Amino acid sequence: MKQEVHRIQEETLAELQQVSTLEALQELKVKVLGKKGSLTAQLRKMGGLSPEERPIFGQVVNETRDILEAAWIRREEELSQTAMLKQLEEEKLDISLPGVSLPQGHQHPLTKVIEEIEEIFLGMGFQIAEGPEIESDYYNFEALNLPKDHPAREMQDSFYITEEILLRTQTSPVQIRTMEKQRPQLPVKIICPGKVYRNDDDATHSPMFHQVEGLMVDRRIRMSDLKGILLSFSRMMFGESREIRLRPSFFPFTEPSAEVDVSCMLCGGAGCRICKGTGWIEILGSGMVHPRVLEMGGYDSKELTGFAFGMGVERIAMLKYGIEDMRLLFDNDLRFLQQF
């Protein structure tokens, strides 16, 4: 019987070397060590042995089982490694193949212009301030020298939510909020970019558009300071050869007030259809902060002065890129947007 066990061991070890797959290895294991396996069958013969022979024979069978199981583990590791290498070879990526190119995205022209405006004024020492788009009547009008019976309110057809709450018509409320928050610290030197809303819709107007307003409050601020800031901005935005002019105007929150024109980018001031033959194009409104607005912000108008300005980002973008219809900026036509 010992010879039979040794024969099973030798034959099994030989077959292990011939097995080439993990499936065949498992089948061989069941054939030898399974419940009906050849080595298991030898254990059933122990009943016919004498009590003295049984432990000796049992030890032989167990030693053989240990040898075969160790051999199985080694062979399984070898086959697993071989299978893995084969799989890696079959799934190997050819890095010489050209990659699939993806379409490149583009910044929206309004985003580009807003970021450029911010960068220019940050370089001049201004800080960015933001505020809510849903605003109170007080901050949007009254604190800006526009009481409820002021005729200038008719100039802005507003979107009211309640009698006292509306979508802001300008970013100027941020200036009042910043003055209240910052007082008595000086200087106040901010720009306020953001969305504003007015009930207007045509080729040059949109019910939602973007503004950037600026405010500087300190001692001895003069109109010449405002002009110098806006001249520097215009040249950095539209080119070093640009000039500006200030025309008298009216805004309730500034006194004196001025419209700011820049020399035409197309004709250089000679006159063309873009500037309507004048050589100048209006770009923003500005002026010295009205004393009442300073008082509403918590500052002494007898000790301090300031200037403010405001521009429509869409208008700046239209002038910078030669866009004739504002609605193109909101149509989401990729053929148009990919030009920028």
UniProtKB/Swiss-Prot annotation:
Q: What is its EC number?
A: 6.1.1.20
Cofactors: Mg(2+)
Where on this chain does Mg(2+) bind? E255
Cofactor binding, per record: Binds 2 magnesium ions per tetramer.
Q: Does the keyword Nucleotide-binding apply?
A: yes
UniProt subcellular location: Cytoplasm
**Molecular function via GO:** ATP binding; catalytic activity, acting on a protein; magnesium ion binding; phenylalanine-tRNA ligase activity; transferase activity; tRNA binding
Which family does the similarity line name? Belongs to the class-II aminoacyl-tRNA synthetase family. Phe-tRNA synthetase alpha subunit type 1 subfamily.
Tell me the protein's name. Answer: Phenylalanine--tRNA ligase alpha subunit
